[in-house]
Amino acid sequence: IRCEAPNDELADPMLAKARIGRILETEIPVGGPIHATPGRRRLVALVGPTGVGKTTTIAKLAANFRLRQRQNVGLITVDTYRIAAVEQLRTYADIIDLPMEVVSSPREMRSAARRLEGLDLILMDTAGRSPRDEIKIQELRSFLSEAEADEVHLVLSSVAGERALVHTAARFASVGTTGMILTKLDEATSLGNLLPLVRSSRLPISYLTNGQSVPDDIETAESGRLARLVL
């Protein structure tokens, strides 16, 4: 900043903050929303550790694409480990009137995807996985490979610590992550932990969530807003 900004700008806190914000905007990559094209099926999977809000985020995305964008949407869940996880997603599917497939093993994935073949967008919910559990990460990799996912978004809680975020993103990179979704912005006091995450992972941020309300509490990520949250 000292190299780029004149002294009078550095002396003014507001001008200095604005300069820092513009620099941060260039350092925080955003990926834009999911693009679902009518008649061309797109399969998007959400992955991540436990408790970050993957299922609720799936419901928000599904409701927005179905009710607001009038896309033909289907759901797949492979989260058969967590108690009531399937029922939670099925409740959303019933409310929004979406077809849903439950997949218990990777070998069932292709037939489930075929049954949803005529849709514009398929959203795939996965079980939360510890980044330290290599066996479960490998199993997740098998599910995604069989699904032939077009996009894999890593869902992370914005209230997690810097080291945990960086470590989690590094471990999930092996499943082919293409973007990130940050959840629980309503619980975060700042996003200072974001810069090390994006610098190490190099993943663009696609969406932000800031509450539990379906379908309202989700927004497309914008670099300017993220820069302001970091500051």
Which residues make up each language-model segment?
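Glycine-rich beta-strand-to-loop/alpha-helix junction loops that act as flexible
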Residues: 47-48, 125-127
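Generic detector of well-ordered alpha-helical packing
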Residues: 78-80, 126, 184
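A short, aliphatic-rich alpha-helical micro-motif
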Residues: 38, 116-117
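Conserved catalytic-core segment of NTP-binding enzymes
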Residues: 74, 85-88, 95, 104-115, ...
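Primarily NTPase-proximal linker/entry elements flanking Walker-type ATP/GTP-binding cores
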Residues: 1-52, 56-73, 77-80, 91-105, ...
